[in-house]
């Protein structure tokens, strides 16, 4: 991701507000079948920014569960006699705590965990606590969820006891069922046994039992459901800038994210410190949400997985020194990582990496079809590193499609340099990114009309409408995204994938906005941009249908009254998407050409997204403040009339009878 200086935030809005109401005739050509729309056309992109993984989609409620943060007790408060040791049972997570009798009957030993901005719990729901532990003699632990802000006689809202008994490390489990709903509870562990006893604790974990698909140690249900409800065709992960790392040592390494969660090593998160004005010193990656879980989620929601791997370049925004990057002649381990990932996803269960997948519970291949190499890279440094990756992958896995990059900008010198390089190298798709202002989105209605159809396909991998002084989610920005997406759809022969970014944000832990889905510890809401994405996905269609006004694409051009439109066909249904970026109601005439003899078009329904609250969105308090509404839509024949509200987006559904 790259930030841009946005200029003239109201220029584009004012430029279309003067458009007057008019009768706009759309000519819709049904004579010939247009370009097929790929199943991957609309999808999602996950990056661990804004506490998207730990504290977000990954449902673990304990922060620093294995005491591996640089400050081993960050997230914890200790009382009594607590030591941190580093010869634990898990090689890549060696730290643990030793609790010892404090030596006085009125003193206590134990520890509290604060969770991620608190621990959200719901009255009557079940929570699964687990810990790896050992002791020389039996030790009783009291496990509690507490409300330290309570004015009641007791802080605890539920408690259970477990007995640690054995010199060898073993996992112990209890269930907790709180009698209150709290957004900011605390997990407390009391050592009750006295007499000089001690107990060692490692990998202390707390999960809701009600996770996505009911998986133990799984995903937060409401957030995963928000992804499934988008019906995405492609799922890009895990980034983004974290793929590169601030330095190569801290890049995202997929091999560290598979296998037992207890032995997945901690990694820093570059979004902890990238923006000093929004600094989060407790933001790390536990890798509990790893590549197996990403592949599994892709399968759950019916999306093709698109993993992105390091090309050997650290973040170029943060590193001017060539020595920060891997020399081209030393790329072999990075290339092998890519080949091994394909084996992990697709290899037989008796192969080296396929066996790890099988041991994790998925003996069948994940049927990986795409892989991305590099993120927002630029200059000759990138293509000279990408080339050996492409050669190696083509040789070993010729059917895998490779995604390259056009860099962080939507136009300019680097963009113009990288596109020919991607063609020369034979990349299958090129990832374009654009976080741009109002006027850019209004000016891009014909962006892809003149792209070379003989080269790589386009992946619009990161985009969102940003506005100076209004860099938050708001309705008008979402409307302009909807307008821009008509160009993606109309050019589906060259644009094969598109994903909004970023995906997730915690209301107390964000570094970047706007974002698609927001949440606190108990609630979540879907933004207006989420509903735009869903409408495009639900009414994706199978093939593009030609739609013009005065012989030109309806793309906000001169004389088109701020209208953007596209049309697709699915069987006997036609879906027409129209964005009205003017402040006037617009009359529409749909003129259908090429209907078979005696066939007519029948209006079925319309879905309208409309609001006069241009700079508002949904929120935790008002999650359905602005949402699409299904309305009636009448008419039958070769010509059908409709109207569209000012500053609104509509999907018109018609049936060929």
Regions found by a protein language model. Give the residues of each.
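Solvent-exposed strand-to-loop "edge" motifs in beta-rich extracellular domains
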Residues: 132-136, 177-179, 538, 579-581, ...
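Surface beta-strand/loop "capping" patches
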Residues: 67, 123-125, 543-581
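Extracellular and organelle-lumenal recognition/adhesion modules and their flexible linkers in secreted
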Residues: 22-286, 304-306, 319-332, 339, ...
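Carbohydrate-binding surface patches
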Residues: 560-598, 606, 647-653
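Conserved, mostly hydrophobic/aromatic
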Residues: 44, 131, 231, 298, ...
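Substrate-binding cleft/loops of secretory-pathway carbohydrate-active enzymes
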Residues: 316-326, 333, 362-365, 408-439, ...
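Catalytic-core region of carbohydrate-active enzymes that cleave or remodel glycosidic bonds
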Residues: 297, 391-392, 398-401, 419-422, ...
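Acidic, Ser/Thr/Pro-rich beta/coil linker or hinge segments at domain junctions
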Residues: 597-644
């Amino acid at each position: 991701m790259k930030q841009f200086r946005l200029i003239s935030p109201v220029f584009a809005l004012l430029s279309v507000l003067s458009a007057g109401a008019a009768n706009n005739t759309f000519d819709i050509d049904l004579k010939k079948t247009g370009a097929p729309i790929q199943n991957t056309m609309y999808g999602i992109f996950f990056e661990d920014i804004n506490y998207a993984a730990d504290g977000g989609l990954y449902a673990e409620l304990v922060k620093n569960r294995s005491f591996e943060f640089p400050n081993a007790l960050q997230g914890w408060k200790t009382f009594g006699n607590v030591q941190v040791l580093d010869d634990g049972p898990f090689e890549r997570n060696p730290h643990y705590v030793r609790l010892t009798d404090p030596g006085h009957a009125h003193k206590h030993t134990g520890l509290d965990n604060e969770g991620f901005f608190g621990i959200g719990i719901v009255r009557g729901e079940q929570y699964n606590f687990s810990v790896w532990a050992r002791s020389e003699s039996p030790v009783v632990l009291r496990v509690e969820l507490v409300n330290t802000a309570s004015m009641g006689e007791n802080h605890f809202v539920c408690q259970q006891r477990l007995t640690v008994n054995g010199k060898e490390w073993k996992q112990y489990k209890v269930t907790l069922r709180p009698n209150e709903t709290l957004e900011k509870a605390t997990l407390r562990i009391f050592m009750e046994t006295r007499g000089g006893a001690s107990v060692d604790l490692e990998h202390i974990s707390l999960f809701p039992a009600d996770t996505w698909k009911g998986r133990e140690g799984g995903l937060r249900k409401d957030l995963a459901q928000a992804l499934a409800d988008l019906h995405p065709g492609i799922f890009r992960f895990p980034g983004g800038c974290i793929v590169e790392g601030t330095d190569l040592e801290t890049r995202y390494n997929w091999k560290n994210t598979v296998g037992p969660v207890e032995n997945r090593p901690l990694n820093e998160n570059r979004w902890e410190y990238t923006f000093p004005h929004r600094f989060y010193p407790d933001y790390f990656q536990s890798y509990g949400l790893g590549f197996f879980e990403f592949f599994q989620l892709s399968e759950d929601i019916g999306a093709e997985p698109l993993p992105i791997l390091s090309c050997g370049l650290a973040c170029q925004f943060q590193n001017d020194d060539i020595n920060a990057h891997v020399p081209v002649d030393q790329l072999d381990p990075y290339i092998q990582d890519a080949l091994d990932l394909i084996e992990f996803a697709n290899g037989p269960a008796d192969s080296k990496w396929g066996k790890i997948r099988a041991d994790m519970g998925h003996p069948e291949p994940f049927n990986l079809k795409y892989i991305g190499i590099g993120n927002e890279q630029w200059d000759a440094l990138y293509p000279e590193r990408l080339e050996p990756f492409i050669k190696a992958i083509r040789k070993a896995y010729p059917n895998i499609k490779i995604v390259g990059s056009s860099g962080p900008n939507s136009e300019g010198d680097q963009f113009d340099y990288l596109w020919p390089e991607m063609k020369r190298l034979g990349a299958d798709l090129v990832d374009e990114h654009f976080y741009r202002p109002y006027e850019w989105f209004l000016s891009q209605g014909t962006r892809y009309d003149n792209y070379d159809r003989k080269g790589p396909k386009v992946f619009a991998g990161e985009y969102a409408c940003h506005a100076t002084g209004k860099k938050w989610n708001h309705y008008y920005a979402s409307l302009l995204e909807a307008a821009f997406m008509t160009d993606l759809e109309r050019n589906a022969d060259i644009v094969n994938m598109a994903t909004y970014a970023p995906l997730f944000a915690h209301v107390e832990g964000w570094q970047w906005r706007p974002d698609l889905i927001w949440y606190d510890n108990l609630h979540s809401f879907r933004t207006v941009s989420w509903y735009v994405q869903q409408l495009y996905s639900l009414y994706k269609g199978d093939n593009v249908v030609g739609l013009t006004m005065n012989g030109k694409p309806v793309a906000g051009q001169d004389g088109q009254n701020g209208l953007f439109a596209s049309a697709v066909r699915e069987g006997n249904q036609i879906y027409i998407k129209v964005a009205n970026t003017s402040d006037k109601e617009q009359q529409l005439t749909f003129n259908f050409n090429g209907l078979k003899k005696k066939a007519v078009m029948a209006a079925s329904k319309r879905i309208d997204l409309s609001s006069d609250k241009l700079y508002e969105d949904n929120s935790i308090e008002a999650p359905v403040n602005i949402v699409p509404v299904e309305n009636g839509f009448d008419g039958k024949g070769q010509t059908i009339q409709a109207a569209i509200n000012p500053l609104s987006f509509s999907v018109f559904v018609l049936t060929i009878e």
